[in-house]
């Protein structure tokens, strides 16, 4: 791993602390800048993961850490909450190494050594979703699950082991065709390989952020509960649970009919894969506009 040196900033908020870490480029990196902010609930003894919201192009998601709804969500799972200000989404620039270096610094600042090893859940909108998908492909063993919302430039090459990382992929019915085609194509290319992914088209919308938090949060909670081992040593690399195909439910992209592994009679290779019946029902309601 490339040697990177952090720049640190400290904030204090009542029952929690917030820290900023920036990782400047070294002479082998070309990602421009990488700035991170993290919140940890003081009542959390041992962290189990990091919920990371990623911004759209030229954005900055660091202020997400002061959002009380997200704080409550992640605290229930004993996760940290993180936002970032990042320029480059391509892992060959060294940006992935910068993320890992930032976690090492946060581990020291928060006095939570487990931050060196716990997995990420990445939820990204537009460019941020593309980043999250690329990060998942780069280091799938450190990602418990991901959400990508309506990006149009996801890497279309083989996803490798990332097919075992549960993903929720959103497209907008009225978005630009290239965005719909990019993510739909990746989904259809990898579902026959067993990718544990969901494709959800939001009807009547364009390039807007998804606000169905019941669906988003249900996916996060379900995946976290299933993928994180009941007993785990968070002070060394964590072996995340691989979810068997038989656990899943499936959903037809056209009829919106869902069914369990044993009962579903649709075309598996082009159907969404859900980690639970509840997530499948949330998808069904979302894509059908509640019909």
Regions found by a protein language model. Name each.
Residues 3-14:
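Sec-dependent N-terminal signal peptides
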Residues 16-50, 120-138, 153, 289-291:
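A domain-start/cap signature at the N-terminus of enzymes
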Residues 52-58, 125, 132, 136, ...:
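Cell-envelope and extracellular/periplasmic
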Residues 90-115, 134:
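Alpha/beta-hydrolase active-site loop
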Residues 144-221:
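The feature captures the conserved acid-bearing segment of alpha/beta-hydrolase catalytic domains
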Residues 193, 203-291:
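Alpha/beta-hydrolase-fold serine-hydrolase catalytic core, especially in secreted/extracellular enzymes
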């Amino acid at each position: 791993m490339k040697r990177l040196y952090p720049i640190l900033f400290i904030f204090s908020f009542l029952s929690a602390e917030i820290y900023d870490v920036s990782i400047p480029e070294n002479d082998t990196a070309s990602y421009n800048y990488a700035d991170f902010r993290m919140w940890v609930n003081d009542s959390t003894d041992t962290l189990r993961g990091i919920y990371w919201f990623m911004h759209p192009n030229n954005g900055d998601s660091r202020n997400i850490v002061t959002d009380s709804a997200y704080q409550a969500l992640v605290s229930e799972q004993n996760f940290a909450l993180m936002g970032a200000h990042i320029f480059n989404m391509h892992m060959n620039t060294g940006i992935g190494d910068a993320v890992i270096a930032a976690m090492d610094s946060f581990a020291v600042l928060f006095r939570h050594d487990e931050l060196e090893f716990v997995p990420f859940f990445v939820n990204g909108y537009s460019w941020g979703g593309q980043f999250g998908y690329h990060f998942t492909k780069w280091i799938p063993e450190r990602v418990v699950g991901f959400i990508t919302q309506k990006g149009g430039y996801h890497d279309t090459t083989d996803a490798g082991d990332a097919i075992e990382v549960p993903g929720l992929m959103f497209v907008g019915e009225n978005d630009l065709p290239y965005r719909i085609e990019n993510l739909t194509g990746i989904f259809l290319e990898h579902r026959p390989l067993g990718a544990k992914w969901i494709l959800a088209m939001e009807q009547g919308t364009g390039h807007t952020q998804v606000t169905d938090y019941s669906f988003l949060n249900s996916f996060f909670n379900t995946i976290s509960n299933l993928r994180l081992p009941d007993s785990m040593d968070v002070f060394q690399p964590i072996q995340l649970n691989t979810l068997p195909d038989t656990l899943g439910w499936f959903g037809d992209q056209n009829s919106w009919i869902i069914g369990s592994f044993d009962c579903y009679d649709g075309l598996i290779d082009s159907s969404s894969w859900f980690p639970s019946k509840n997530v499948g029902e949330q998808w069904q309601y979302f894509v059908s506009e509640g019909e």
